[in-house]
A protein has these predicted regions:
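Regulatory input/activation interfaces that engage signals or partners
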Residues: 86, 91
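Catalytic core of PPM/PP2C metal-dependent serine/threonine phosphatase domains
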Residues: 16, 24-27, 48-54, 98, ...
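Conserved beta-strand-loop-short alpha-helix elements that form
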Residues: 110-123
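Short histidine
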Residues: 120-175
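A generic structural motif
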Residues: 59-61, 104-106, 159-161
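Acidic loop->beta-strand submotif enriched in PP2C/PPM serine/threonine phosphatases
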Residues: 92-112, 147
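Short coil/turn connectors at secondary-structure junctions
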Residues: 79-81, 108-110, 153
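Extreme N-terminus nucleophile/cap motif
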Residues: 1-74, 83, 172-187
Length: 187
């Protein structure tokens, strides 16, 4: 599907090498989508953990199992299993596993949402902006999500654990500015 890509704020990886320098500029990457069976670079994972220290949410793409950990437990991602991972940097809500992505979308427990950015007008000290938006999306048909999320200057990954599928919604995940930082991108 993808080959040799890294993008901001999502990193799409097909190949990895532990000797490679981390392509992560400070305060940027939070989500990693790994769709192959090669373990990721420890330096990439460590850097993501350091700059986004407030939680780690993972959905494994082989069985769509979700787990939530501390960012410091990044070595869990040293696996051959494909996954989508979100390293949290707190902007709204408290630091807790409950406030770590992905979020269940309302009462539809098959639908999950990961998000990068801040949604104006959403969130509080008790609930993150992403969690509030996920709850709202849960009351809408999935087909309406694209229109709703395109209104925000943000990027989203919507995951359906029953259908074992995911898609990108909202702003384009591809950042042309990132190629300067990306040793994995082959021209």
């Amino acid at each position: 599907m993808f080959s040799n890509y890294c993008f901001l704020p999502f990193i799409l990886l097909q190949e990895s090498d532990d000797s490679m320098e981390s392509p992560l500029p400070a305060n940027t990457n939070r989500d990693i989508i790994k769709q192959n069976d090669k373990p990721m670079s420890t330096s990439i994972l460590k850097t993501a953990s350091k700059i986004n220290p407030h939680g780690l949410g993972i959905v494994y793409l082989d069985n769509y199992q979700m787990i939530k950990l501390k960012s410091s437990e990044y070595k869990t991602l040293k696996t051959k299993r494909p996954f989508i991972a979100h390293f949290r940097y707190k902007t709204k809500g408290v630091v807790s596993k409950a406030n770590t992505h992905p979020f269940v979308c309302g009462s539809n427990t098959d639908e999950l949402l990961m998000h990068n950015g801040t949604i104006s007008g959403y969130g509080s000290d008790k609930m993150t902006d992403s969690e509030q938006l996920a709850i709202e999306l849960g009351s809408m048909p999935r087909q309406a999500w694209k229109n709703k999320l395109s209104k925000y200057d943000s990027r989203f990954v919507a995951i359906n654990t029953h259908k074992k599928s995911f898609e990108y919604l909202g702003m384009s995940i591809f950042s042309k500015n990132f190629t300067n930082f990306n040793p994995l991108l082959k021209k």
